Amino acid sequence: MGLAEGLAARMAPHLYIQEPLSAQQLKKLEEHKYSASGRSLVEPPMQVYWNWLVEKVPLWLAPNTITMVGLLLNVLSTLILVCYCPTATEGAPFWTYLLCAIGLFVYQSLDAIDGKQARRTNSSSPLGEMFDHGCDSISIVFVNLGTIAAVRLGTLPGWMFYCCFVGMFMFYCAQWQTYVCGTLKFGIIDVTELQISVTVMFLMTAVCGPELWDYEIPFTGLPMKTIPLLGIIGGTVYSCSNYFRVILSGGVGKNGSTVAGTSVLSPGLHIGLVLLLALMIYKKSTTNLFLQNPCLYTLAFGFVSAKITIKLVIAHMTKSEISLQDTAFIGPGLLFFNQYFNSFIDEYIVLWIAMVISFADLLRYCISVCLQIATHLRISVFRISSNQAAEQVQTQKQKLTD
C-alpha cells in the first residue's frame, strides 16, 4: 500500500468512512468492460502529441498519479485566480491567467495519457476508469470558475449563472447517456475542444488583459465576452441534442431501460434537483448571495454535482440503481431551509458551511470508494502493483484513447 493510501486508511476511522459499494456491486464491477465510440474534431492531431508525451512518462508512474497531479495543478491555478476575482468582476495579474492556461493544458494532457499509461503498463482496471471520470467531474467545476473570472462575467449576472452550471450539467448528461446505452460516445465537439478553447481564452486574457472582454464589438454594441458566450450556448445546444437523442431513444436494458434496468429518465432527478436548488436560492436570496459570492456559490453546488456524477459513473460500471437520497444535498438543503425561515442566519455564513459540508462529503465518498475498490481488486490507487487487475478494456475506437 502506498503512502497516500496508507494515510487515507489511517484517516478513515476519523472521517467515519464506510464502504459505499455492496458485494453485488463489486462483483458487477469486476465484470465491467470499458466501451467507447466516436472521435472529436481535434483528437486526431492531438493523438500524435499524446502518444509522444506518454512515451516520456516512466513506466513506474501509476496512471491515477498522473491524473491526480494534473487535477491538482488545474485546481490550484484556478483558486489563485479566484482569490483575485471573487466576484468575477475584478482584474488579476497577467501571470494568474497564464498559470490557469498552463494548469488546464497540463491537466488536459495528463488526463489524455493516463489510459495510455495504464495500457502501456498493463495496469488498466475499473478503478482507473472511475478515477479518471471522477477527476473530470471535479475539474469541470474549476474550469467554469476560471472562465467566468477570466472574462469578468460578473457584469452579466444571468449569463454568469448559466456558465457556472451548464458545464456541470453537460458532463453529467454525458455520463447519463453512457448509463443508458452502455457506451461512452464522443461527439465532433467534445471536452477536448472545450479545454483547448478555454486555454486559448486564458492566454488571450493574459496577453491583452481582462479589459479585452469588455471592448465593444464594432457595429453591434455588444461586449467581446459575447463571443465566448455564443460558443458556450452553441456547444450546449449541440452536445445536449446528441445526449438526449441517445437517452430518449431507449437503453440497452430490458424494454429500453438503462444498463441497470431502470428508467432512462431517472438520473435526471439528481442533476435536476441540484440545478433547481441552485436557481431557487439564487433568485430568492435577499442579499444577492450568488452575485456577491459567485465563486463560493459555484463551489458549494459544484462539489454536490461532482459527487452525484461520480455516483452515476459507478452506477453504470456496477449496473446498479442510483438513489436520490444522498448526503450530498445537505449543504444546499441548509441554504434552502435558511431562506425558508427568512434567513435567520446570515446567508454568507450558511454558504460557507454548505460549501465545507459539500466538500467534506465529496472527499469522504471519494476516499472510501477508492479504498474499497482498490482493496477488492488487490491493487494500489497511486502505485502500479505487482498484482494488477486483469486488463478490462473493450473499445470500439480505432486508436488508443480514453
From Swiss-Prot:
Consequence recorded when altering Y34A: Reduces the enzymatic activity to about 35% of that of the wild type
Outcome after substituting F186A: Reduces the enzymatic activity to about 45% of that of the wild type
Transmembrane segments: 63-83, 94-118, 126-150, 161-179, 191-207, 223-248, 266-281, 294-316, 330-339, 347-376
Coiled-coil segments: none
Residues annotated as the enzyme's active site: H133
Catalyzed chemical reaction(s): CDP-choline + a 1,2-diacyl-sn-glycerol = a 1,2-diacyl-sn-glycero-3-phosphocholine + CMP + H(+); 1,2-dioctanoyl-sn-glycerol + CDP-choline = 1,2-dioctanoyl-sn-glycero-3-phosphocholine + CMP + H(+); 1-octadecanoyl-2-(5Z,8Z,11Z,14Z-eicosatetraenoyl)-sn-glycerol + CDP-choline = 1-octadecanoyl-2-(5Z,8Z,11Z,14Z-eicosatetraenoyl)-sn-glycero-3-phosphocholine + CMP + H(+); 1-hexadecanoyl-2-(9Z-octadecenoyl)-sn-glycerol + CDP-choline = 1-hexadecanoyl-2-(9Z-octadecenoyl)-sn-glycero-3-phosphocholine + CMP + H(+)
Alphabetical list of Pfam families matching this protein: CDP-OH_P_transf
Pathway annotation from the record: Phospholipid metabolism; phosphatidylcholine biosynthesis; phosphatidylcholine from phosphocholine: step 2/2
Chain residues that bind CDP-choline: N64, R119
Binding site for Mg(2+) 1: D111, D114, D132
Positions of the record's site feature: Increases basicity of active site His: E129
UniProt cross-references to InterPro entries, sorted A to Z: CDP-OH_P_trans, CDP-OH_PTrfase_TM_dom, CDP_ALCOHOL_P_TRANSF_CS, CHOPT
Enzyme Commission no: 2.7.8.2
GO MF: diacylglycerol cholinephosphotransferase activity; metal ion binding
Ribosomal protein listed as a keyword: no
Cytoplasmic compartment segments: 1-62, 119-125, 180-190, 249-265, 317-329, 377-402
Family to which the UniProt record says this protein belongs: Belongs to the CDP-alcohol phosphatidyltransferase class-I family.
UniProt-listed PANTHER family: CHOLINEPHOSPHOTRANSFERASE 1, ETHANOLAMINEPHOSPHOTRANSFERASE
Subunit structure: Homodimer.
Protein's UniProt name: Cholinephosphotransferase 1
Organism: Xenopus laevis (African clawed frog)
Taxonomy of the source species: Eukaryota, Metazoa, Chordata, Craniata, Vertebrata
